[in-house]
Amino acid sequence: AAPGSAAPFSTLRPGYELCRNCHADMVDATLAKGRVHWAVADKKGCVNCHGPHAAKHDKLLTKAGAESCRDCHADTMARIAAAPVKHKPVDSGACSACHSPHAANGVHLIDQPSINTLCESCHDYQTHSAHPIGDKAVDPRNKNLRVGCLSCHTAHGGDFKWMLHSATNIELCTRCHKQFAR
């Protein structure tokens, strides 16, 4: 567009293709992952979060830390803000402690083989749990599911101590083990 015109800014190449000219290794590694964040893959590509030439924040981010995430994930951020108990990385605005902002091979853009593995990268399962989890721990509600960290805990924050789904152990256990309900 001509200087001073109302026409939108345009580039020689769309989205991440423009960035690939100089950052081919990073763009190619990102696109090779199993799950690519929509913000990378859409028509604006990298400039959804990064300034093309300069920005006030590290890594040319147009907004600091979690503020970049808030633009598109406002509903999640609102739930987190309302939760009385928050996961420490979430409370500090460090979304990238668990989620990759660009792409990952794991669900929910986590770069771990499973949610349990992600949790165990900071939390010692043997110290923090009395319940088995993993491939051998079958969910009593559905034989096709396995018990994992999120069976009892919320990921970002919640209403109860230790981010549990229920206020008491009895309530928590009887969510799956109905035979123990009073």
Language model segments and positions:
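Short sequence/structural segments immediately N-terminal
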Residues: 1-182
